[in-house]
């Protein structure tokens, strides 16, 4: 990303553009700024300033760790909201998260899942709603599983009544 592109983009734009972060969806600024959504997160005022201001130069020594964790935890909350579920639904329908490697699942689209809601315990996996198994993603991602949490697939299918898990489909 050139520095001219960075002048008009935020840390969030820069972060989402990093290879391996394609499972994440954009959390809107109004959601990030809402203090209710920040409850329980440490250093939110300092980190909020960094992630919302324009990035001038990606080589200027950004504090990548804290911002990544903070954005990841806000992301985990956002994808459980109505707007977040809609954003993840679009990605799911496009197959952005990949497909199940199990041959009997017939290339079923998958969802990201964390094995723990605790930061640093494991990287993101993909979850097949047909066979209910978790797999390592084929993509080159090292995202923390807490950015999605262990309950995201269940919440996704329970909150989107028009989209049921293929396991519930009487044709399968």
UniProtKB/Swiss-Prot annotation:
Pfam families: CK_II_beta (PF01214). PROSITE patterns: CK2_BETA. Induction: In wild-type flies, it is strongly down-regulated by double-stranded RNA (dsRNA) interference mediated by Su(Ste) transcripts. In males lacking the Y chromosome, the absence of Su(Ste) locus, relieves such down-regulation, explaining why it is strongly expressed. One of its GO terms (molecular function) is protein kinase regulator activity. InterPro entries: Casein_kin_II_reg-sub_N (IPR016149), Casein_kinase_II_beta-like (IPR035991), Casein_kinase_II_reg-sub (IPR000704). One of its GO terms (cellular component) is protein kinase CK2 complex. Probably not expressed in wild-type flies. In males lacking the Y chromosome, it is testis-specific and constitutes the main component of star-shaped crystals. There are multiple copies of the stellate gene in fruit fly, encoding proteins that are extremely similar, which makes their individual characterization difficult. Thus, most experiments probably do not discriminate between the different members. Unknown. In males lacking the Y chromosome, its strong overexpression leads to the appearance of proteinaceous star-shaped crystals in the primary spermatocytes causing meiotic drive, possibly by interfering with normal casein kinase 2 activity. Belongs to the casein kinase 2 subunit beta family. Interacts in vitro with the casein kinase 2 alpha subunit (CkII-alpha). The relevance of such interaction is however unclear in vivo. This is Stellate protein CG33239/CG33241. It comes from Drosophila melanogaster.
């Amino acid at each position: 990303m050139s520095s001219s592109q960075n002048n008009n983009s935020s840390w969030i734009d820069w972060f989402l553009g990093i290879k391996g972060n394609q499972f994440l969806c954009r959390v809107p600024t109004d959601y990030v700024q809402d203090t209710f959504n920040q409850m329980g997160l440490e250093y939110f005022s300092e980190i909020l300033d960094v992630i919302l201001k324009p990035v001038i130069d990606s080589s200027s020594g950004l504090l990548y760790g804290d911002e990544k964790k903070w954005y990841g935890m806000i992301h985990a909350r956002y994808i459980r909201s109505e707007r977040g579920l809609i954003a993840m639904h679009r990605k799911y329908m496009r197959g952005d998260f990949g497909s199940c490697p199990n041959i009997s699942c017939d290339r079923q689209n998958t969802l990201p899942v964390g094995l723990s809601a605790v930061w640093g315990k494991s990287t993101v996996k993909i979850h097949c709603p047909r066979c209910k198994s978790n797999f390592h993603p084929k993509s080159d991602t090292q995202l923390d599983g807490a950015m999605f949490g262990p309950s995201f697939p269940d919440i996704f299918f329970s909150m989107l009544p028009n989209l049921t898990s293929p396991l519930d489909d009487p044709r399968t």
